[in-house]
Amino acid sequence: MELLNQKKIASLTEEIGADNVPVLLEIFLSELESYLKVLCDATYSDKLVYLKDISHALKSSAASFGADALCHFAVEIDTRAKEGDALDETQDVVAMIDRLHQTQQAYLSWQANGF
């Protein structure tokens, strides 16, 4: 699974216009940063609640921005949570933090190279 799906990014660029991509990308990157902060700063008992909320929110935004690996993981966590499957505070939260960070870094690199 691709970290960033270039075809989806190109499609988004075509739909909204190349001038709008940097603005929306900044908003998305800001969201990723806030999710990272929430998960890293949350108390032990709150981490799973935030993980569920963040996963639900990321399903559509990550898909829209072509963040396929992040979207796939968010869908997996959201589905497991809705089905009542136990989420692991350590493993699942750490995996989400890792995917958020990887996606953020990939977009920052892509942005630095002029989109």
Swiss-Prot record:
Pfam families, alphabetized: Hpt
Molecular functions per Gene Ontology: protein kinase activity
Membrane-spanning segments: none
Gene3D superfamilies: HPT domain
InterPro entries with a match to the protein in the record: HPT_dom_sf (IPR036641), QS_phosphorelay_intermediate (IPR053403), Sig_transdc_His_kin_Hpt_dom (IPR008207)
Limits of the HPt domain: 17-107
Keywords attached to this entry: Phosphoprotein, Two-component regulatory system
Domain of life: Bacteria
Record PTM Phosphohistidine, positions in chain: H56
Listed GO biological process terms: phosphorelay signal transduction system
NCBIfam families in alphabetical order: Phrelay_LuxU_Vib
Primary role: Phosphorelay protein which receives a sensory signal from a sensor kinase and transmit it to LuxO. At low cell density, a phosphoryl group is transferred from the sensor kinase, probably on His-56 and this phosphoryl group is further transferred to LuxO.
Description of how the protein assembles with itself and partners: Monomer.
Protein name (database record): Phosphorelay protein LuxU
Organism: Vibrio vulnificus (strain YJ016)
